[in-house]
UniProtKB/Swiss-Prot annotation:
Gene Ontology annotations for the cellular component aspect, listed alphabetically: cell surface; extracellular region; hyphal cell wall; side of membrane; yeast-form cell wall
Inducers of expression: Up-regulated upon milbemycin A3 oxim derivative (A3Ox) treatment.
Positions of glycan attachment: 129, 178
Protein name: Cell wall protein PGA30
Topology in membrane: Lipid-anchor; GPI-anchor
Family membership: Belongs to the SRP1/TIP1 family.
Record's signal peptide: 1-18
Annotated stretches, region: Disordered: 219-246
Processing and modification events after translation: The GPI-anchor is attached to the protein in the endoplasmic reticulum and serves to target the protein to the cell surface. There, the glucosamine-inositol phospholipid moiety is cleaved off and the GPI-modified mannoprotein is covalently attached via its lipidless GPI glycan remnant to the 1,6-beta-glucan of the outer cell wall layer.
UniProt KW keywords: Cell wall, Glycoprotein, GPI-anchor, Lipoprotein, Membrane, Secreted, Signal, Virulence
Residues lipid-modified (GPI-anchor amidated glycine): 253
Length: 277
């Protein structure tokens, strides 16, 4: 008696989708005057915002497909993207210029071209003269500037790392479409092909006990908890032993009855004669 298991394995391949996440930037410095201050932007021109240090941090967006940091500028019914750029030695958000390629490490460290020389500086001669009272974020700051490191903190409890995108299993029940798969088995002397139809239900391993050949009509799991049905094919019956009595036709049977009846009559007659004598 042979046992075999039919199992259907469904592989869910999911592609990593680009994510845009909310992020805030902070200053990390040995100078307590600016340490832990947040980065905010202030409008300095058409579509241009310079970055400054403040007690709170502005929420920006990070695109982990293009590795850019940006904000969304509403202009009437349209939305323009102001990307993080460096222009004239000033770190800013702008609708023009080449967006910086930004990488955020596990510890939140922000790295881009010129990030190693970022500093806080005042009196940079900005258009609206905000730097008279606030520290502007610049690269290659001059005398009196305070170097610092930019640290990113994602909003919403996500991990800081964006260098590697992870693919996670879906949390909702997947929807399966009908499919036909072919499974090759090697439990028989000859190769056997079994075709299964996968329906909307999630199939589970089904054990079928069989001897000889068997046709599997369905392997869908039943809604009850009963054991799966067992299908068996009875072995062919053995050859009956040869009969020792020769076959008798109806005519021969009738003749035998007549002969038997005549013998009985003769015996009775003989008995009667004996009594008479």
């Amino acid at each position: 008696m042979k046992y075999f298991t039919i199992a259907t394995v469904l592989t869910l391949a999911s592609s990593a989708l680009a994510a845009i996440r909310d992020v805030q930037l902070f200053a990390q410095s040995s100078n307590e005057e600016i340490n832990n201050l947040g980065l905010i932007s202030r409008r300095e021109g058409a579509g241009v915002n310079y970055l400054f240090l403040a007690s709170g941090a502005e929420t920006l967006k990070f695109d982990d497909e293009t590795f850019t940091i940006f904000s969304e500028l509403q202009t009437g019914s349209t939305t323009a993207r102001q990307s993080l750029v460096v222009s004239g030695g000033v770190v800013q958000l702008s609708v023009s210029g080449q967006p910086l390629h930004v990488e955020i490490a596990e510890d939140g460290s922000v790295k881009f071209a010129g990030s190693d020389s970022v500093a806080a500086a005042k009196n940079i001669n900005d258009p609206y003269n905000y730097s008279k009272d606030s520290f502007a974020v610049v690269t290659n700051g001059g005398e009196g500037s305070i170097p610092f490191k930019i640290i990113a903190k994602f909003i919403g409890g996500g991990k800081s790392s964006s260098v590697t995108k992870h693919t996670e299993a879906p949390t909702t029940s997947p929807v399966y479409s009908n499919k036909t798969v072919t499974v090759f088995t090697t439990y028989c002397p000859e190769s056997t092909t079994i075709t299964l139809t996968i329906c909307s239900e999630v199939c589970t391993p089904t054990v079928i006990e069989t001897s000889g050949s068997v046709t599997v009509s369905s392997v869908l799991p039943s809604s009850s908890t009963e054991a799966p049905p067992k299908t068996s094919v009875a072995a062919p019956s053995t050859t009956a032993e040869a009969q020792t009595t020769a076959p008798v036709t109806s005519y021969e049977g009738g003749a035998n009855e007549i002969v038997g009846g005549g013998s009985m009559a003769i015996a009775l007659a003989a008995a009667a004669i004996g009594l008479v004598i």
